[in-house]
């Protein structure tokens, strides 16, 4: 196996890592993640990051704009893969950082960290194109199964990919979920990864076909029950990079600028300081290139679907 720091530098350049090294990385990652709780405790200061979706060069910009992994703590809210041209390199870079700096980075599972979704939205095809088989995809999917479902910052900020669930009122209930499996089509684990905030009075069916829509009543109830001040989540494209809702009780953070190389949005990360103050850093996309090094030209009409 290549040395970890050598793999990190190779991935940062978007270059090929051999299959045996990836297998070893994924096995080590599973062993490390196996010992993490469903909801990981994180101290401040920390930087909270939203969806990445395989946009490696923008991920590198994210680290550059926010101080870097060597001196800062990070929480990534999931959706590392699919849609972008460098899903594998983006996910493996974060896995390497987790192995290199285990106390500095938390990787939460998103709705795209599943076998079913990655077979449809790009990650599976990317791996087969780059390696000629699906072995590396399988290794990564096994890591997905061990990713935690949430994080709690200073017992005051609850971090999750999607949102809330009618089956979960307390954070302690999330800790009892058996997470080490493919994401189910319904139930608490599914909802945490798929639900969205909306201006609704009560739980409503989601147009995504999974999870629920939830409003301020449910957010206020969750905040009060768990004595937390903020829900930080991702999962939805926000043109301005972040969006606060429900009197500041919830924020959506989006960290993939010019999403799908065509949407024209900026990206953001959220830093929570020791005194619990919030500071957003906004950044724009770098010039996107495909896996062959060719500049990607934006399409004229973005066509979005519900599986963000």
From Swiss-Prot:
Any Pfam family hit: Metallophos
InterPro entries, A to Z: Calcineurin-like_PHP_ApaH, Metallo-depent_PP-like, PPA2-like, Ser/Thr-sp_prot-phosphatase
Entry's cofactor comment: Binds 2 manganese ions per subunit.
Residue positions where Leucine methyl ester is found in the record: 308
Gene3D superfamilies: 3.60.21.10
PROSITE patterns: SER_THR_PHOSPHATASE
Active-site residues (renumbered): 112
Keywords from the UniProt entry: Cytoplasm, Hydrolase, Manganese, Metal-binding, Methylation, Nucleus, Protein phosphatase
Alphabetized SMART domains for the sequence: PP2Ac
Catalysed reactions, semicolon-separated: O-phospho-L-seryl-[protein] + H2O = L-seryl-[protein] + phosphate; O-phospho-L-threonyl-[protein] + H2O = L-threonyl-[protein] + phosphate
Enzyme Commission number(s): 3.1.3.16
Residues the entry annotates as binding Mn(2+) 2: 79, 111, 161, 235
One annotated GO molecular function: metal ion binding
EC class (word): hydrolase
Cofactor(s) demanded: Mn(2+)
Subcellular locations according to the entry: Cytoplasm; Nucleus
Subunit relationships: Catalytic subunit of the histone H2A phosphatase complex (HTP-C) containing PPH3, PSY2 and PSY4.
The family this protein is said to belong to: Belongs to the PPP phosphatase family. PP-4 (PP-X) subfamily.
Function: Forms the histone H2A phosphatase complex in association with the regulatory subunits PSY2 and PSY4, which dephosphorylates H2AS128ph (gamma-H2A) that has been displaced from sites of DNA lesions in the double-stranded DNA break repair process. Dephosphorylation is necessary for efficient recovery from the DNA damage checkpoint.
Name recorded for this polypeptide: Serine/threonine-protein phosphatase 4 catalytic subunit
Organism: Kluyveromyces lactis (strain ATCC 8585 / CBS 2359 / DSM 70799 / NBRC 1267 / NRRL Y-1140 / WM37)
Gene name as annotated: PPH3
